[in-house]
A protein has these predicted regions:
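Single conserved hydrophobic/aromatic residue that forms the stacking wall/gate
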Residues: 1-14
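Non-catalytic interfacial helical region
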Residues: 5, 56-167
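Short cysteine clusters
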Residues: 12, 35-41
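Conserved beta-strand scaffold positions in the cores of enzyme catalytic domains, especially
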Residues: 18, 52-54, 134
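Post-Walker A helix-loop "phosphate-sensing" segment adjacent to the P-loop in P-loop NTPases
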Residues: 21-33, 44-47
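Short coil-to-helix "N-cap" segments within the ABC nucleotide-binding domain's helical subdomain
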Residues: 32-34, 142-143
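Short, conserved catalytic or adaptor-binding loops enriched in Gly and charged residues
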Residues: 41-47, 127-128
Length: 167
């Protein structure tokens, strides 16, 4: 339930998160691709989805902000299958923030997906990284990314159409 990606380009990190979120939550996949028309896709495209939260850890890195996020975890998604939390620049979180995330990462609710984006994997505690699939977007090919995501979704028993992952 956690994907960690590294890329120097913020656009790559955020685009990947949006594409995956739409692929996971689209109600009307068209030949395996998000329709970009259903409520879920439209809300993600407009940046107004309650079920897709983007957090900038560079400015919201403290324990109080992390606890605030964790308080929302038990609530089911409002209009999507999954609630997705994108924490960009995750390596900026404090030690206390990482520790508070650990229990949720160890026992994630079935309706929650975390996406951690960073420029520096080495700054993330090993206890956190060991619970995430790690994708280095600086050197990954599209085919390699699709293959890795297919493995993860299969392992996590997340239903998907492989063609939805073909970027």
């Amino acid at each position: 339930h956690c994907i960690s990606s590294a890329a120097s380009d913020v656009y790559k990190r955020q685009s990947l998160a949006r594409i995956l979120t739409k692929a996971l939550n689209c109600r009307n996949l068209i030949e395996g691709e998000p329709c970009n028309d259903c409520d879920s896709c439209s809300e993600i495209n407009a940046g107004s989805s309650i079920d897709f939260q983007e957090i900038d850890a560079a400015s919201r890195r403290g324990i109080s902000e992390t606890k605030e996020l964790l308080e929302t975890i038990p609530y089911l998604p409002t209009s999507s299958k999954y609630k997705v939390y994108l924490i960009d620049e995750v390596h900026m979180l404090t030690k206390e923030s990482f520790n508070s995330l650990l229990k949720t990462l160890e026992e994630p609710p079935p309706h929650v997906i975390f996406m951690f984006a960073t420029t520096e994997f080495e700054q993330i505690p090993p206890t956190i990284l060991s619970r995430c699939l790690q994708l280095n977007l600086n050197s990954v090919t599209v085919e390699g990314l699709v293959e890795q995501l297919s493995k993860i979704f299969s392992k996590e028993k997340i239903k998907f159409e492989k063609s939805a992952l073909d970027l």
